[in-house]
């Protein structure tokens, strides 16, 4: 027998003690707050790791993921054991509803909240949303003391974490309270919200931590067990097919039940494995030689070597070749699965369903007879293995038991964005949790771009006290804004509503010189007003000088009195001696003294409403780019004011590509995009012209650095550009190719998830819809 296996079996050998209580059935002898458990001379540590998009990856990407996962298995320490566990946790319905449903506020919007909650509950009743999957890696090692074990775990955990990061899977170490929570949620399924454990308080009172996690009762039968009011059964993979598909583990864990599937792995040092295989091959060759000698003695000189001997020789040679030339390792593994049900009948039905999945893959999943207690301890992420049905596998053969399926987006306090196409789970994202909350919504006309923004806007309006501001160049947002009790401000050349382009709140520069930032804004504004040509160096200097002179008295007066206007700026230009100043003044005269001077007057608009929309559709082609820029600067002033009040702000900019057509306006937007994150604001840009957007280097940078993107149906040229920019695989691109309304991809942080959204056609839907017939009905 291989020395490593012999040593492992010897070390794992335990003295059997009949448990006298349910607490005794939990084999943890001692634990430390950092999450290390002790069982005899064995210590264990658990990491939780996130899922990755394996199921929807292209063939090339799957191969790359498979090889990266194989490298992780190859890197496992030969002096320790590893357990990979997939945990299906039934979501507590009451807790889940409390987390996602919008509470009543006894105001005029409660009717919409009721409709929104009904929509969410319609999605939640789908069985897939009642189970949440978690994945763990448990490392266990025999050491003389916890200090030695801790040193070992520090080294190995760092290596495992870095290799998981290479797979885009993020991991975290579980402390003792979190590890015990996993056990509590399994042993006391349905009572997840009742978990309360303070280790210091337990020690002070002299209580055992096992009291907080153990079930009320635990009775083991021949092929199942009864735990409290639940029935359970432990199965193990008894027979393996010669070829197993990489989807088998995902299919087994796809059952909508409380279950845990664990893969116990014992790595073997390569030198030992090679020596063992060489001895095995020598034994097979000896058997072949002896057989041929017997045939020769019977004068049978043409006899063919028996099939079984030939197969043994072939398989041994192949495995030896794998180890010596293909960087494979020999590993011992056993797969165990424990599942729970509410009744014996349901348990038997679930067992048959699991066995049917295994049979489909030409494998045999069998219940453990009279070993249910040992099997339960083995299947849980404790770090123990009491089942000896080990199978010799190479790295490749073990990597086929792939624990990855699809990424999920489920943030605490997240907003609903649709359902994951792969798992059918709700996508709940909290943009405030991301490195920056800014984002884009991209899609061709009719793909659901505006609807997506309005759905998020409505959810925020109904569930938070955050301020919401829209810049609407198409007059599409009026129904939803007014329906939610907001204010729509019409701005045009003939409108009585005016916004001063030179408004400046105290704190505009965020501790820096506010005139510098305002100068950049006026440079971008003048560039827009002067047409397609770029400003010369002289003109830039003149504009900067005039800006400082306009604001000198206002800032020295403590931001009191009349705010300068574009008329003041125009007059200041005329006072300059340079002829270039008069050229700039003449170029902007139409917008200061002429018929398009709506932004050259003092602000007379009340913008204090929590939900505000600037309707700029009637500005016309001449004023629209300038109008978007001025409104954006006004919004920035509002964001600064909200920051002082400790209030978050959400900004939606439709047809954002218009701002990227000129260098200075693009740079102003880029600066704003970076600054608002510090002020507790999130900006969202919407456009159907992705190709036009990406012509701007600034826009490409903003798009590539955005943590949140919603990509709906895309034109072919846009798909190619997005694929290059965001490294989207061909398989993922299929989710934004000729798809229906409300379908696409969501990029949230590092996760890219295919989604779909079927919103019921209620009153809230009619407020959000931009389809003419439905919009008319809402009106």
Task: Give the positions of each predicted feature.
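Conserved lysine of the Walker
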Residues: 449
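P-loop NTPase motor domains
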Residues: 52, 59-78, 89, 253, ...
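Hydrophobic positions on the alpha1 helix immediately C-terminal to the Walker A/P-loop
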Residues: 452
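Conserved P-loop NTPase
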Residues: 726-778
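Hydrophobic anchor at the beta1->P-loop junction of P-loop NTPases
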Residues: 441
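Post-Walker A helix-loop "phosphate-sensing" segment adjacent to the P-loop in P-loop NTPases
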Residues: 459-469
